[in-house]
Amino acid sequence: MAKVSKRVAANKAKIERTKFYPIDEALGLVKGCASAKFDESIDVAVQLGIDAKKSDQVVRGSVVLPAGTGKSVRVAVFAQGEKAEAAKAAGADIVGMEDLAEQVKAGNLNFDVVIASPDTMRIVGTLGQILGPRGLMPNPKVGTVTPDVAQAVKNAKAGQVQFRVDKAGIIHATIGRRSFDDAALKSNLSALLEALVKSKPATSKGVYLRKIAVSSTMGVGVRVEQASLSA
């Protein structure tokens, strides 16, 4: 353990907080500083050139990461009839209507994503106080309220991540695990950044992607030189 601690400490000492590193070097430093015994997530923080206080500049959406997230996701779906059967065939873990709503009200939230067909929102809408604070409330902006529930299930299982800008104008997202190779992490980061650019508010002026930093679950943030992302 002492050797591991010394290695991690040495790697942390290499990081200059104000320096912007080429993406390959940044990922190497992040992995080198990952000291937890579990497979830490690799996270990204993107500072956007927006005014998060303005309602027309709230950036929100979702993207399917090409290399996945490295996490097994349980999906619950509110649907009935043919759509319910399609959701089950697509791999949904829980499918229901009033019965599923009762499970939620009872505190049985054994799922990571909730998807709803538009015609079920009369039921789902009553669960806002439970699902909302947990980030589970279905929303058309992130593709979780949709007529095509089967495709939404497939997206969730394939590694779809949702993003929403915080009050400081920063997007936080996970782009993989420490065990991922750099190519997988870079492809996921590129997909996320592309989705963010597509979600740029029309009223946003100036530089949009201002700063990008990567980190591990228990590690420090490393700033990324944006020019290296297109190299």
Swiss-Prot record:
One of its GO terms (biological process) is translation. One of its GO terms (cellular component) is cytosolic large ribosomal subunit. Signal peptide: none annotated. InterPro entries: Ribosom_uL1_bac-type (IPR005878), Ribosomal_uL1 (IPR002143), Ribosomal_uL1-like (IPR023674), Ribosomal_uL1/biogenesis (IPR028364), Ribosomal_uL1_3-a/b-sand (IPR016095), Ribosomal_uL1_CS (IPR023673). CDD domains: Ribosomal_L1. PROSITE patterns: RIBOSOMAL_L1. Pfam families: Ribosomal_L1. SUPFAM superfamilies: Ribosomal protein L1. Gene3D superfamilies: 3.30.190.20, 3.40.50.790. GO terms for molecular function: rRNA binding; structural constituent of ribosome; tRNA binding. PANTHER family: 54S RIBOSOMAL PROTEIN L1, MITOCHONDRIAL, LARGE RIBOSOMAL SUBUNIT PROTEIN UL1M. Part of the 50S ribosomal subunit. Binds directly to 23S rRNA. The L1 stalk is quite mobile in the ribosome, and is involved in E site tRNA release. Protein L1 is also a translational repressor protein, it controls the translation of the L11 operon by binding to its mRNA. Belongs to the universal ribosomal protein uL1 family. This is Large ribosomal subunit protein uL1. The lineage of its organism: Bacteria, Pseudomonadati, Pseudomonadota, Betaproteobacteria, Burkholderiales.
